[in-house]
Each structure stands twice: as structure tokens, then as C-alpha cells.
Regions:
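Intrinsically disordered, low-complexity Ser/Thr/Pro/Gly-rich regulatory segments
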Residues: 1-143
Length: 143
């Protein structure tokens, strides 16, 4: 089992919202090696270019894997669709209605660069970082 922050009781795990993150929390905790560190819901401030302001952001999961690097994961639950031509992402609700959402890969990518900047400011350079998205409620892919 991986080291995970925060460590939650079964009751607390069952209260994680959205439920898609609950599934991923359980899977990462149980299936990753015990020398790996998983941080769930890592909050950070992102410096924006407009007026040098800051905005709060969150990475759903950040995995620190010794000898491999750092992986930042964005989780999207329920139905998810991406229009290949416009590259617009949608969530699909129970009534099959589409709702525009942010690009989950873009969200993970932004978080990755913020984490990289944070590490570099502390002298931690040359660390391999990657990003990705998980869709735990998707059972098939229609191309």
C-alpha cells in the first residue's frame, strides 16, 4: 500500500466527493508500492499573468514515485466526452445532457508546472514530471 495524504478512515473515504475521486483514492492507496507517496486534493496558488494576481487551484492526485518522478492526475467522473475538432470537453449527466468542462489534461498540466516551479524554488531540479487524466466511470470508448 502506498503512503497517502491525507490518511482517511473508511467512513471518511466513503464521504469523498466526487465519488470518482473516492474510487481513485482507494485504488492508488491499495495498489501502489509502499515507498510511493500519494497526495489527494493538493491545493496551491497559481500565479496568473493578468495583473500578477494569484488564484487558488487544486490537483486531484499527485504521486511521488521514487526513481520515476512525479505524476499529476486530474479525475473526471460520470460520462465524459471530447469533441475532436473543437477540443471542447463535456461532462454528461444522468439525463444525457452535456455540460462544458475544463480540459482535464490542461488542468493536470497546469498543476504539474506549478509543482515543478515549487520544487525548483527549493533546489529540486531534474525531476521527471508527467500529467494525465483518469475517467474511472467510463466503461467503453467510442471513437
Amino acid at each position: 500500500m502506498a503512503n497517502i495524504i491525507p490518511i482517511l478512515t473508511d467512513t471518511q473515504i466513503s464521504e469523498i466527493e466526487p465519488k470518482s475521486e473516492q474510487k481513485v483514492y482507494k485504488a492508488l492507496y491499495k495498489q501502489l508500492p509502499n515507498d510511493w507517496l500519494v497526495i489527494h486534493s493538493l491545493e496551491f496558488m497559481k500565479k496568473t499573468s493578468q495583473y500578477n494576481s494569484h488564484g487558488d487551484r487544486e490537483a486531484d492526485f499527485v504521486i511521488f514515485a521514487p526513481e520515476y518522478g512525479v505524476l499529476v492526475i486530474e479525475v473526471k467522473g460520470g460520462g465524459v466526452e471530447c469533441n475532436g475538432q473543437t477540443r471542447q470537453w463535456y461532462s454528461i449527466d444522468r439525463d444525457q445532457n452535456k455540460h462544458e468542462i475544463k480540459n482535464p489534461l490542461g488542468q493536470a498540466k497546469d498543476a504539474k508546472y506549478e509543482i515543478r516551479n515549487h520544487l525548483e524554488q527549493r533546489g529540486k531540479r531534474n525531476i521527471l514530471l508527467a500529467h494525465g487524466a483518469l475517467f474511472p466511470d467510463i466503461s467503453n470508448i467510442n471513437a
